[in-house]
Amino acid sequence: MNIRKPLCSNSVVGACTLISLTTAVILGHLMLRELMLLPQDLHESSSGLWKTYRPHHQEGYKPGPLHIQEQTEQPKEAPTQCDVPPSSRFDCAPDKGISQEQCEARGCCYVPAGQVLKEPQIGQPWCFFPPSYPSYRLENLSSTESGYTATLTRTSPTFFPKDVLTLQLEVLMETDSRLHFKIKDPASKRYEVPLETPRVLSQAPSPLYSVEFSEEPFGVIVRRKLGGRVLLNTTVAPLFFADQFLQLSTSLPSQHITGLGEHLSPLMLSTDWARITLWNRDTPPSQGTNLYGSHPFYLALEDGGLAHGVFLLNSNAMDVILQPSPALTWRSTGGILDVYVFLGPEPKSVVQQYLDVVGYPFMPPYWGLGFHLCRWGYSSTAIVRQVVENMTRTHFPLDVQWNDLDYMDARRDFTFNQDSFADFPDMVRELHQDGRRYMMIVDPAISSAGPAGSYRPYDEGLRRGVFITNETGQPLIGKVWPGTTAFPDFTNPETLDWWQDMVSEFHAQVPFDGMWLDMNEPSNFVRGSQQGCPNNELENPPYVPGVVGGILQAATICASSHQFLSTHYNLHNLYGLTEAIASSRALVKTRGTRPFVISRSTFSGHGRYAGHWTGDVRSSWEHLAYSVPDILQFNLLGVPLVGADICGFIGDTSEELCVRWTQLGAFYPFMRNHNDLNSVPQEPYRFSETAQQAMRKAFALRYALLPYLYTLFHRAHVRGDTVARPLFLEFPEDPSTWSVDRQLLWGPALLITPVLEPGKTEVTGYFPKGTWYNMQMVSVDSLGTLPSPSSASSFRSAVQSKGQWLTLEAPLDTINVHLREGYIIPLQGPSLTTTESRKQPMALAVALTASGEADGELFWDDGESLAVLERGAYTLVTFSAKNNTIVNKLVRVTKEGAELQLREVTVLGVATAPTQVLSNGIPVSNFTYSPDNKSLAIPVSLLMGELFQISWS
């Protein structure tokens, strides 16, 4: 063995003294930088849902006062095995900057490394673990009906307080493609995430994986049986399990990693010493910061197009470190290590397997897929009515009108301004009469400012004990938009009933259709509370992840505050999810139809109850481009109903930016234009006629494609598919697709290539191998009531790709959308609302392969009823093309689907002009064939709910 002495042996002590002094200065600077407060942190700004509670600490535990003196670390011998490749060094000083002497006293190696860093990089560690660093030892391994159990023991404590020296390992081989293992304290109940997950009592019969264990140092090694590739190897660094610091590291089989949302980043994450922090935070998106949601799940692509995923079911504040070796380290501040490994083997299957655990997405109402419009500053019903009238007059679709805080009385939930919104209920009823819906903002914080008896939500909440409490048992009081506020505890069953009552009572006054949940990280304009926070170990843990503001209570409530299930320290990242669950439940019980909830804060499993918008994005080309990986990321995380504020929220947009953003936004699963009070208005009708024409064209295309989009949501709901998806999900064997995040697919069939830079009239995109047909060849304008301006420029009818980057014409009025060979998609005549568009005739676009084949399907129901699958109240029709013939198959037909009229079929890829076209055996005389585009347009008069056959020869 090649043994190296630690740096600064006696022979070079003089030089090393100088190095140590320099290092101390640098580390001091870095420590200040890590704890630096942002300006907004330095002042105040104007049911059976859960498993059994398991508290974080032992029964009866209360957090004690913080002892300010530094934790005494038992000095260890300086290591002699420090010849570790730089990319494989694991940080031995994650908690603070330390000197060489302190590092070596921990038994670790110290080698300075000069680097220039850019967020989210943290840099190569100077103090790192030697291979011989003590960890846990595996003992008493035994087989069980579902896997294995073992005891893990540590003989020497670490440098974190309250080590748990004896642990229990439970390994569950749950399915052939899912492995589940837990590491926890057998002697003390600790907090576990109360997420409803599958319980499996038997061992998988034919797993795709093998599991191995390293005895000392302890580790779990997971391999693919086919090929033997190591997917998980936790022996690469020591395991830590202290009361408030848990660390688990693993090697990675490749550097192609995605997931770990929510962050402003490319689709593929950097493994160049990147730190990803998960602690939900109200802050405008910027690189290297913790944002509104936490999803501790990653998907890794492997050579050959295989993929696997790993999910750490832990809701505590955490960092995830990615390093070049490649390797990943989880660092959590509490809970247990509850790990799922998904074997795929293809990326699509990994996502489905993850959703098998956290839940499949909810099925949105059809109207929710239309266009939504909002602005902070619609300050009266007169203004809202004028906006709606302007949208109609200028022929822009509008399905859902929204209001921000403006509608409220003193910015309090479940109230409305009796002056500027005096006829609020009438306004909402008028929207309904015109076939539209209405949504408004609801913040979780409840005003506590008024005298007793003046505000029912607070009075009732106090009486029923629904608020989060401080160390004295009284409601914790913070400050949000209405002034002083209390925060509902949505883990309390009583709170769910209280919230439902408040929603129902307000709905009886104002018949709104959905709820927009904002500020639910939860956000707080003071740190912790009006009275501050206790000085205890939950507020000042021994390890603080890289959160904005440097402390957990920054811009939120005290970590040590009390909730029904545990402390906020454990439950903070679940706050948005629990409010979404409560709101979805309240809407179902109040309205009796499918709920529609959009929430800013999210956690794993959120898509089961609600959608998401990406927060306070800026009106910039940079944020336009970042919205593509944002939307793709949330689809991989099981939240397909997602979108960014079209044209941007913060700052003034430009005409060109708003046109390009509207074109891309037409392909967000959730399409909303919304902006800030202090920014210029940006409704579509505000711009020049040229810009309006370009936007109308994008609107018309989206509304024409809604039947296909709705079918994709059905597949997401029943199968765990994505709606918007990255190219690698469909083409995993093509490595060129892996990092593509300036394009997106809708399902398997539509490829969208937006313009994301100013001043461009062409765009470059990657086209996987095959034929891609330009959707400009498919027109359904004549079927609807919404005219779509035709493009003034010529276009390329089809792309024949060998798997290559291609440059396409993209004038201002055009977003390139291509239909993939082998697919049939349903379309419908577009109108100003989905209420009207659902009444229009339908069409099929058929994209033939070289062998003349294609397939597709249509899912249809009434668009808003509950339990349509359970009641069989839906229509499902499949389509197939082969041998110059298109036929349908009726899987199930109900009244609504039976009445759908099919009026137009466009067949793409017809090599030669036909001489005869038949519809159910009857000749069609007025078909048209384009020899230039190789397209065949067939007018028909058929019903989707009846068998048909269309052929040409």
Curated annotation (Swiss-Prot):
Task: Please give the Gene Ontology molecular function terms for this protein.
Answer: alpha-1,4-glucosidase activity; carbohydrate binding; glucan 1,6-alpha-glucosidase activity
The segment(s) forming the P-type domain are: 80-131
List the signal peptide residues: 1-27
CDD domains listed in its UniProt record: GH31_MGAM_SI_GAA, GH31_N, Trefoil
Q: Which reaction does it catalyse?
A: Hydrolysis of terminal, non-reducing (1->4)-linked alpha-D-glucose residues with release of alpha-D-glucose
What top-tier enzyme class does this entry carry?
hydrolase
User: Can you give the propeptide residue ranges?
Assistant: 28-69
The entry's substrate-binding residues are: 404, 600, 616, 674
What positions does the record give for glycosylation? 140, 233, 390, 470, 883, 926, 933
A Pfam family found in this protein is: Gal_mutarotas_2
One Gene Ontology CC term in the entry: lysosomal membrane
Query: EC no.?
Result: 3.2.1.20
Q: Where in the cell is it found?
A: Lysosome; Lysosome membrane
Which cysteines are disulphide-bonded?
82-109, 92-108, 103-127, 533-558, 647-658
Q: Which residues form the active site?
A: 518 (nucleophile), 521
A GO biological process held by the record: regulation of the force of heart contraction
Give the keywords, sorted.
Answer: Disulfide bond, Glycoprotein, Glycosidase, Hydrolase, Lysosome, Membrane, Signal
What the protein does? Essential for the degradation of glycogen in lysosomes. Has highest activity on alpha-1,4-linked glycosidic linkages, but can also hydrolyze alpha-1,6-linked glucans.
Report the sequence similarity comment from the record. Belongs to the glycosyl hydrolase 31 family.
Q: What is the name of the protein in this document?
A: Lysosomal alpha-glucosidase
Native source organism of the sequence = Mus musculus (Mouse)
| Lineage of the species this protein comes from | Eukaryota, Metazoa, Chordata, Craniata, Vertebrata
What is the gene name? Gaa
